[in-house]
Amino acid sequence: MSGSYQHLSNVGSRVMKRLGNRPKNFLPHSEKFIKKSTPEFMKSDLKEVDEKTSFKSEKEWKFIPGDRVVVMSGASKGNIAVIKSFDKRTNSFILDENGPTKTVPVPKQFWLEGQTSHMITIPVSILGKDLRLVADIDDEKTPGKTRTVAVRDVSFNGSYYDADYKKVMPYRCVKGQPDLIIPWPKPDPIDVQTNLATDPVIAREQTFWVDSVVRNPIPKKAIPSIRNPHSKYKRGTLTAKDIAKLVAPEMPLTEVRKSHLAEKKELAEREVPKLTEEDMEAIGARVFEFLEKQKRE
C-alpha cells in the first residue's frame, strides 16, 4: 500500500496505517489482489514481511550497501557482487549487475530517460541466507599480502563510534574468530555541488571563538535583530492569565473531609494540660512502688 498521501494530515496517516493492519483471514485474498494488480516489473518473488519482523539494525541485516558478497544460489551462483541497497519490504538485498537479474516488459509511461525498448533488465532481490560476505584478510603464506575469502557467517562483539556513518556501529567479526574484525564499507560521498547546499568541510570549520565567560559575545544592539523583542516569552512579567495557567485549581472538599479538618483544628486549638507538682509526686510514688515490687519478686 502506497503511503504517498500520509503528508496531507494525521488523519491520512492513520487511515494508511489502518489499511496496513489487515485481518489475518483477509490476508490471502488481499495479497492475491495486490499481486494481480501490481505491474510485472514491480513484483517481487519474495514474500513481504510485516513491520514487526522487518530488519531495522545493522546486526539484523549483517550486510550493508557497499559490502562485497558472493551469490550462493541461482543462476548467478559464484558471482561476486556489491550490495546497492536494502529491500525493506522483504528483508532482502539489491545487488549490482553481477547479481541476479530478470528481463521484464515496462509500459511506455514508465520508461526511463534514454530507454528505447519495452524490455529491460532489472535486479532481483535476494535474501541474506543466499549470500556470503567477501573480505580481504592477511595471507599467512605470503606476509604483507592479502587474499580474498568468503566468510561463512559473522558475529558482533562490542561497538564503537563510526565517524563516516556518524553513529555507534557494532564491531563485525568472523564467527568463531572475534579477533578478526571485518570493517564496514565507507558510505558513498554526498554530492553537495549545488547552489542550495554547503560543503560539509566548510560547514564544520570553526570561525568564532569565545574569549570571555563574562562579556556577551553578541553586541547588545544586535540582540533585537536575532530575538523578537516583542515575544510574549521575553516579557519578564506574568499576567493574571499566565498565573491562572500556572496555579492549579483548588479541589472541592467532601463533607467527610470538611468534618475531619474541623476536628483536627479543634484538637490543635485545645489547651494541653500541664503537670502540677502534686501530679509529678503521685507519678514518682507509683513508679517507686512498682520498682520495689519488682525487687521483692
Curated annotation (Swiss-Prot):
Gene Ontology cellular-component annotations: mitochondrial inner membrane; mitochondrial large ribosomal subunit; mitochondrion
The keyword Ribosomal protein is assigned to this record: yes
Record's keyword terms, sorted: Acetylation, Mitochondrion, Ribonucleoprotein, Ribosomal protein
InterPro entries xrefs: KOW, Rib_uL2_dom2, Ribosomal_uL24, Ribosomal_uL24_CS, Translation_prot_SH3-like_sf
GO molecular function, one term: structural constituent of ribosome
Domain annotation KOW: ranges: 63-96
GO biological process: mitochondrial translation; translation
Modified sites of kind N-acetylserine: 2
Main location: mitochondrion
UniProt xrefs under SMART domains: KOW (SM00739)
Coiled-coil region list: none
A Pfam match: Ribosomal_uL24m-like
Compartments (UniProt record): Mitochondrion
Function: Component of the mitochondrial ribosome (mitoribosome), a dedicated translation machinery responsible for the synthesis of mitochondrial genome-encoded proteins, including at least some of the essential transmembrane subunits of the mitochondrial respiratory chain. The mitoribosomes are attached to the mitochondrial inner membrane and translation products are cotranslationally integrated into the membrane.
Recorded family membership: Belongs to the universal ribosomal protein uL24 family.
UniProt subunit comment: Component of the mitochondrial large ribosomal subunit (mt-LSU). Mature yeast 74S mitochondrial ribosomes consist of a small (37S) and a large (54S) subunit. The 37S small subunit contains a 15S ribosomal RNA (15S mt-rRNA) and 34 different proteins. The 54S large subunit contains a 21S rRNA (21S mt-rRNA) and 46 different proteins. uL24m forms the wall of the exit tunnel.
Name this protein carries in UniProt: Large ribosomal subunit protein uL24m
